[in-house]
Amino acid sequence: MTKIQQLTLEFGEYLKDESRSCGHADTISFPRTTDDVRQVLAELASLDEERGTCTPVCVQGGRTGLAAGAVPASGHVMNLSKMNAYLGMRACDDGRGATRLFVRVQPGLVLSQRRSDLADKNIPCAGFDDASMAAWRAFQEGPEVFFPTDPTEVSATIGGMVACNASGARSYRYGAVRPHVSALRVVLADGQTLALTRGQVKEHDGVLSLTTEQGGCIEVPVPAYTMPSVKNASGYYAAPGMDAVDLFVGSDGTLGVICEIELELLAAPAVTWGVSCFFEQEQQAMDFTCAARERITCASAMEFFDEAALAILAHQRTTSRAFATLPVTPEGARCCIFVELVCQSEDKAYEELWEIADLMEQVGADESRTWVARTDLDREAQRFFRHAVPESVNMLIDERRKTDP
C-alpha cells in the first residue's frame, strides 16, 4: 500500500524542477502501480470529505521541465518516478508485409533507459503475457527500431513527455510526441479509470463520449477554438474528429493521472549523421535554413544557436569543469545551424552532406567550418554541446539567485 507522507525537509527537492521555481505542499506519495494511484486519490478524497477541503494534486515525473509544471502550489505531490516498468509489447501487420511494433510502459520510465533498451534490444519481459512475448520475439529478431521524439534532456520521463506533448529537435521530421502515442490508461480524480486506444473514440458533434472501466459515462465538450498548425502548448488539444487519446496528451496532468502509455516504434534509419554549420552573419544562417528546408530531404532536425548561446558555451567552457570538454567553436562564428540527417545509405548521406556544403557556399559561408558527427561517440559529443546551452542558462540563474533571490 502506498503511503501518503508529510512533505518534510527530506523531500524538499520535490518542491522544484529545472525551472528553478520552488513551491510548497503538505504531503507526498510515490505510487508504483495504477491501483496505488487510485488508493492515494481515494484517501485524499476521504480526508477532504472529513475536513470539507479540496486538495490539489501535483503530478510529477522526472522534474526536468523548464516551465514549472512539476512545481506544486499547495496540497499533495504525487511523484511517479517509481512507476518505471515495461508492461508489454504489441505487434501487428502494417498492411504492406511489415510488422508494426508497440511498447507499453509506466510513466516513470526514463528516456535514456528506454533509448538504450531499444538500441540494445534489452527490454525486460518478465511478466509479459503470451501476446506480448510474441511481439517481444519479433522485436528481438527484427530490424532495429526507435522512438522518434527526442527531447534534449535524457532524464525526462515518458509520462512527463506525454503530459507536456514534448517535441525536441526531431519534431522537424516526426512531429511532437502526440501522434506516436497509441494508447493510454488514465486514473481520473474520482478514482475511475479510462482505457483509451487510438481510433476507438473520436469527437462527434463537438463531444467526446468516454466510458470508464467501471462503467461510468463522461461527455466531454471539445473546445471550438482552432489550433495553430505550429508547435503549441497552450490549452487542451481540440480538432474536428479528434481522438480521445489526443485530449490527454499535452494536458499536463490536469485531467487525470496517466498510468500506462503505449508508444509506436518506428524503423530506425540506417545512417544518422549530425552536422553543425557555423556562420559569421545571422542572415547567412537564415538564408541557409530557408534553402535547406527545400533541398535537404533527409533532415530530421534543424536547430538554431544564436550569438548569445555560443557566448554562454564559450564562457562555461573556460569557467566550469563540467563543460571543460566542450569543443571550441570556429573563430568569428556568430551563430550555428545544427542539421541531423537520417538516410537509408551512406551514399545518400554523403549526397546530402555535399548539398549542405553547396548551400553554405551559396550564402557566403565557409563549408569547412562545420562539425560532422558520423559515429555514436561524435553524436553524443554533439548532443552534449546542444544540451549545454539550457543547462548553462540554469546554472547562471542559480548563481544570480545567490545575490538577487
Regions found by a protein language model. Give the residues of each.
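N-terminal flexible segment immediately upstream of the FAD-binding catalytic core
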Residues: 1-55, 62-101, 116-120, 126, ...
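C-terminal substrate-recognition/cap domain of FAD-linked oxidoreductases
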Residues: 4-11, 249-251, 257-405
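Conserved hydrophobic/aromatic beta-strand scaffold that supports enzyme active sites
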Residues: 28, 77, 183, 276-278, ...
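Residues at or immediately preceding the N-termini of alpha-helices
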Residues: 34-37, 83, 111, 282, ...
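ATP-grasp fold ATP-binding core
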Residues: 57-61, 147-148, 302
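Short beta-strand segments
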Residues: 60, 79, 106, 159-161, ...
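Short, ordered loop/turn segments at secondary-structure junctions
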Residues: 61-64, 199, 304-307
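FAD-binding subdomain of flavoenzyme oxidoreductases
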Residues: 87-89, 95, 107, 111-112, ...
